[in-house]
């Protein structure tokens, strides 16, 4: 997660769908940040965020409060992954023929970690 726009938008969409079709459960929302730039994980403002995942190198997310609500409402979790874990996930994806930028590999790193 960087500015947390995606996770908040996804949650909004899941809720709108759920209101119309209650036969499906709402998901538990998971968000992953680089350990060098993890303001939502650590509940702080990171003055000098540092990570190879430039797309999520955000020290003070615009959607901080919305993201906190998503975590609470969905009974979800936010966790951090190291740059090394991101790189390892990136390499694993590449072996499968899937090429992405490091911020996208952060989610896969988080899933591997769990």
Where are these regions (language model features)?
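Gly/Ser/Thr-rich loops at beta-strand to alpha-helix junctions
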Residues: 1-7, 104-106
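Amphipathic alpha-helical interaction segments
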Residues: 88, 106-109
């Amino acid at each position: 997660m960087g500015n947390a726009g995606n996770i908040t938008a996804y949650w909004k969409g899941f809720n709108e769908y759920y209101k119309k079709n209650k036969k499906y459960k709402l998901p538990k929302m998971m968000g992953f940040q680089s350990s060098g730039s993890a303001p939502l994980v650590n509940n702080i403002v990171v003055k000098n965020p540092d990570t190879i995942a430039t797309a999520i190198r955000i020290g003070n997310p615009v959607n901080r409060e919305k993201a906190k609500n998503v975590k609470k409402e969905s009974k979800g979790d936010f966790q951090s992954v190291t740059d090394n874990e991101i790189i390892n996930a990136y390499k694993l994806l590449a072996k499968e023929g899937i090429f992405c930028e490091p911020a996208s590999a952060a989610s896969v790193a988080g899933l591997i970690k769990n």
